[in-house]
UniProtKB/Swiss-Prot annotation:
Keywords: Carbohydrate metabolism, Cytoplasm, Isomerase, Magnesium, Metal-binding, Xylose metabolism
Gene that produces this protein: xylA
Active site (UniProt): 100, 103
Assembly and oligomerization: Homotetramer.
Entry's Gene Ontology molecular function annotations: magnesium ion binding; xylose isomerase activity
UniProt xrefs under HAMAP family: Xylose_isom_A (MF_00455)
PANTHER family xref list: PTHR48408, XYLOSE ISOMERASE
Protein name in the entry: Xylose isomerase
Residue sites binding Mg(2+) 2 per the record: 267, 270, 306, 308
Top-level taxonomic group: Bacteria
Localization per record: Cytoplasm
GO biological process terms on file: D-xylose metabolic process
Catalytic activity: alpha-D-xylose = alpha-D-xylulofuranose
């Protein structure tokens, strides 16, 4: 059965085409900085927003009528959902996908049913991957939707909930390994608090660290060679989450000796919820040595919640890609569309329109970022700004050649009187705009 029979395979037709079901800028074979666009972007489609979400919101019921979401045998519906998903991936031409365990398999009425159902669906996903050539970018476990996780999973006051969550992660990590996944994501959606009046912060942080340490141990025990990733988010659904932003995650990992084992998966909308730009979070992750992967989406600046819209800003993404490219690009990570169509977008075509447009935006932004990397003007001005630290005096300070006392004495003896130099921000912004808007 075909679920998108009337939708053709999406092809590159160039910027002059007016076909809404074609790529206008994403030519996957085009080479930029020595790689094809497909190799640079490593695009993934997420299972949850695309095939699981029924179109509900807090004020209304599901608006979608997807065939695989209708009542029926749960495992059969899960197989139909997988068939629809891989038909979609194949027609879109994206190389990767991502999932939560309960996206792909019915949870059942017990932990044993969960394990059995998930095992059956992992077998089926393996068959679909083999037939299509689509690969798994990352897997994860849903430790936030069921009421048992209302007070968290790893940070729950009930150790039985901790044990249930550990079981899910064990099987989700095993499945990711078996399916050839390149990363495993840990999103602590409810690892936080609603009120400090009933919360033991120290205990919950220790529980979270113990949980992560167990995941790291299991990764090595089964021989999974992919990356473990935490996805920072400041709040929602909880009032405050312990993985607030990149800097918070890095501090937490360092406190518990996990900084060499776990990196971050950065979502654009989560960055803005934390009061940061997407650019900032990516740059900070590289500076701290924990960059892993990206969830591509956007939020609405007029809303204070996670709207998970498709990315549509070449300007924003150019700066994000500039950081990624100048640090060598993705390794195991990629650009996962953690984005969903709007609730009123009920037609099957809308799923394609959202992804096609966003993929074109990624391609445009990456090419603009490549211009900034190739012309080296931003980097040259950055090097010049810090050049004095590469001189003998600057190197001596950083290498421990001075104490606070001896450095102060030296400054007094030399009568230092440093003058302020321009940061040239306006010129730098002009360089970025020239790269984005120059006619080609």
């Amino acid at each position: 059965m075909s679920y998108f029979e009337h939708i053709p395979a999406i092809r590159y037709e160039g910027p002059q085409s007016d076909n809404p079901l074609a790529y206008h800028h994403y030519d996957r074979t085009k080479r930029v900085l020595g790689k094809t666009l497909e190799e640079h972007l490593r695009i993934a489609v997420c299972y949850w927003h695309t095939f699981v979400w029924p179109g509900h919101d807090i004020f209304g019921q599901g608006a979608f009528r997807r065939p695989w979401q209708q009542p029926g045998d749960a495992l059969e519906r899960a197989r139909q959902k997988a068939d629809a998903a891989f038909e979609f991936f194949t027609k879109l031409g994206t190389p990767f996908y991502t999932f939560h365990d309960t996206d792909v398999a019915p949870e059942g009425d017990s932990l044993r049913e969960y394990v059995d159902n998930f095992a059956r669906m992992v077998d089926y996903l393996g068959e679909r991957q083999q037939a299509s050539g689509v690969r798994l970018l990352w897997g994860t476990a849903n430790l936030f939707s069921h009421p048992r996780f209302a007070a968290g999973a790893a940070t729950n006051p009930n150790p039985d909930v901790f044990a249930w969550a550990a079981t899910q992660v064990r099987h989700a990590l095993d499945a990711t390994h078996r399916l050839g996944g390149e990363n495993y994501v840990l999103w602590g959606g409810r690892e936080g608090y609603e009120t400090l009046l009933n919360t033991d912060l120290k205990r919950e942080r220790e529980q979270f660290a113990r949980f992560l340490s167990m995941v790291v141990e299991h990764k090595h025990r089964i021989g999974f060679r992919g990356a473990l990733l935490i996805e920072p988010k400041p709040q929602e659904p909880t009032k405050h989450q312990y993985d607030y932003d990149v800097a918070t995650v890095h501090g937490f990992l360092t406190q518990y000796g996990l900084q060499d084992e776990i990196r971050v998966n950065i979502e654009a909308n989560h960055a803005t919820l934390a009061g940061h730009s997407f650019h900032h979070e990516i740059a900070n992750a590289f500076a701290l040595g924990v960059f892993g992967s990206v969830d591509a989406n956007r939020g609405d600046p007029q809303n204070g919640w996670d709207t998970d819209q498709f990315p549509n800003s070449v300007e924003e993404l150019t700066l994000a890609f500039y950081e990624i490219l100048r640090h060598g690009g993705f390794t195991t990570g990629g650009m996962n569309f953690d984005a969903k169509v709007r609730r009123q977008s009920v037609d099957p075509e809308d799923l394609f329109y959202g992804h096609v447009g966003a993929i074109d935006v990624l391609a445009l932004a990456l090419e603009r970022a490549a211009v900034l990397v190739e012309n080296d003007r931003l980097e040259a001005m950055r090097r010049q700004r810090y050049a004095q630290w590469d001189d003998a005096f600057g190197r001596k300070i950083l290498s421990g050649g001075y104490t606070l006392e001896s450095l102060a004495a030296d400054a007094l003896a030399r009568g230092v009187n440093p003058q302020h130099a321009s940061g040239a921000q306006e010129r730098l912004e002009n360089i970025v705009n020239q790269a984005i808007y120059a006619l080609r």
